[in-house]
Amino acid sequence: MDIRTLSKKLKLSITTVSRALSGYSDVSAKTRTRVEKFAKKYKYSPNPYASRLASGKSNTVGFVLPLYGLNSNNLNQTSFFEFISGMTNTIHSENIQFFMMFANTAEEEKKAYEKLIYVQKVDKIILHNLKKKDSRIKMLKKNNVKFVTWGRTESLKNYSWVDLDNEGSINLIMKYLIEKNHNQIAYINIVENYNFAFQRQQGYLKSLKNFKIKYNKNYYLSVKNEEPEESAALIKNMLKNNPKITAIICSTEYSGVGAIKACNELNKKIGKDISVITFDGPVVQLLTTPALTAISHPRKELGSKAIEILLDMDKKNYTPKSYLAKPKIVERGTVNTLKKI
């Protein structure tokens, strides 16, 4: 059945039926309920293109996945697809469209966003890999495109976001390690121009201060986002020069794999001679023996929440919303308890 036939049965205009099925408030609740019951009875599913014409909106969510920089290795790409899985589950249940583009360079990424706005005419976008200052936010606001960010900039003014509690996660890890009598704790981060990396760095520094542990610059490592081999070489060198280190915190899953490689090359038994804890990824725990103890990162949940917030933006008097996922530690086999001295 098409919308024309359905509207005739209901004795309503096509526009009214379309807007009722889209949940617009200018159609009374009584009429919306009646239309929905008829649509269900006759198994009618709205044509998305017809809905666009009736509403004047594309009702499409755009997403750009860069395949360079932070996502240049397969581990991080897998993490993004878990977030996307959470997005698409909610998207499909709400009968809206999803358009994803890929970019191999920064220039391609810029053009991809321009294409989403000017060619595909999406009216909603999800941003990710937020920098401390991110020009994409200004661009989307200028073009009146609704958006939610996965992550935060250093300023939280006038936009909606979902994120993991990065500082809180590091504080939780530090507390966990200190309760197991570790105080020689190294931290492996990535370059801090990504705001989540900066937040985690701040969490590490604040935790050291709170737990009255003196900061040792030799215990902090900031690595570029490349393959795990690069971080492995740097971590190996750090451990050789600082033999008192008893635990390593890894800010990303690929550096966690690098830490394991470094420890193995130095014949350090993980979970006995040295402890390693990382931010969890959907595959990283399958790549290591013993399995990595990690901070759980609910990417699917964040993806779903991002879409829910985007949909709320169509309501009147919308104000920016945020969702901060609380961290939890998943204990596996890579952290040991030291004897108390």
Give residue spans per PLM region.
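Short, well-structured alpha-helical segments in soluble
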Residues: 109-121, 231-244
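N-terminal helix-turn-helix DNA-binding module of bacterial transcription factors
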Residues: 1-59, 340
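Amphipathic helical "hinge" segments at domain boundaries
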Residues: 45-111
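Flexible loop/turn connectors
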Residues: 232-341
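Flexible loop/hinge segments that line or gate small-molecule binding clefts
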Residues: 128-168, 254, 280-292
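Short acidic/polar active-site loop segments enriched in Thr and Asp
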Residues: 13, 59, 123, 183-184, ...
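Hinge/beta->alpha junction and helix N-cap segments in small-molecule ligand-binding domains
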Residues: 70-80, 100-108, 162-172, 188-234, ...
